[in-house]
């Protein structure tokens, strides 16, 4: 597996033009795309395919999240989170956060943005109102069953820590689940005490973790590695015990997962097969759409009717009708899109 930091495939920088000064408010339905190779957040209209503006977003932005009137962008190469005001995108705040922020998760009840730090093996807590770091939780050096290293396929340097890449918050707000690339497990942080509790086994090359709509399970997508470390299934874990209760066939290198809020449908993408796959609530496959090898980001829009599928190699975001899997549009000309957030 040719992987860069945090399991993100490395891309050479591009010579895109400098971002224009942000202008109008970001309207509901617009896409905010983290352009890794351009150091920008691209704002795009999914209906027309037009890129409306680009906003400077730190070095190598790789994650994006919309929360409480702001777009948060994790700058994986610069140790900062960029916050863009949705009502006035000329208001941009840079928040210094650790070494390499990748996973982002927001707790609206507490007003806290959780930031997974890949190289520091830590979880940072950012006060969303103050736009400042207020606490850091350090993960233990060893993970599930005392793991300290990734498998050979995914190793850069031995013993470099847990390498958190994705986060999910328990619906009760008491636990944070952290999918780790280095020890291919799921760390659990008790948010009341700030302490890590027993980890769950995970997946090689994790990319995304979700709490299921009913709160009973964790959905874990991973791209795997080489040989026996290849992953072609979506892993479903019991949220109480961590036991893997189901392996759902998707295709080679499962790079993303999304679920309807009522649990009636689930979608996943197979990066190396280039397919978007749909399932019903009982995990019966209901359809496939071929979008091309390299698709590595999957997001369900707030309207619950539209899927956004990014291809960081091809520089595209595909707009797909969720119920029918019909391809509605493709946004071209993006500089290694790594994540997508949708304005609600």
Stretches found by the model and what they are:
Residues 1-344:
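Predominantly soluble domains enriched in secretory-pathway, periplasmic, or organellar proteins
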